[in-house]
Amino acid sequence: MKVFSFTIGLVVIISLFAFALAYDEETDLMKKLVEMERAIEQRIICAPEGGPCVVGIGCCKGYSCAPGLLGLVGHCQ
């Protein structure tokens, strides 16, 4: 009975440790994504003539986005 209790306790401790590590990695990933998003927002992004245009990246002044295949990615003209 003591071996069973010890085994269950060990499994619980290892599981908690694994969840803690996974949470830390997820938190770090979210921080990196937020930093990347801020960097993109700070830059002025526009696509030149013939360049791809998608949601969030529009065409430079004087060009408009022509819809592409299935309306996913267009091109500036």
Swiss-Prot record:
Which residues, in ranges, are excised as the propeptide?
23-43
Subcellular localization is given as: Secreted
Q: What is its main location?
A: secreted
Cysteines engaged in disulfide bonds, as pairs = C46-C60, C53-C65, C59-C76
Which keywords fit this entry according to its UniProt record? Disulfide bond, Knottin, Neurotoxin, Secreted, Signal, Toxin
Its cellular-component GO annotations read: extracellular region
Tissues expressing this chain: Expressed by the venom gland.
Q: Which residues form the signal peptide?
A: 1-22
Q: Name one GO molecular function term.
A: toxin activity
Ranges that cross the membrane: none
| Domain of life, source organism | Eukaryota
What UniProt notes about the protein's domains is: The presence of a 'disulfide through disulfide knot' structurally defines this protein as a knottin.
Give the family per the record.
Belongs to the neurotoxin 14 (magi-1) family. 05 (ICK-7) subfamily.
Q: What does this protein do?
A: Intrathorax injection into crickets causes paralysis prolonged for more than 60 minutes, followed by recovery.
Q: What is this protein called?
A: U8-hexatoxin-Mg1a
Origin organism is Macrothele gigas
From the broadest rank down, the organism's phylogenetic lineage runs: Eukaryota, Metazoa, Ecdysozoa, Arthropoda, Chelicerata
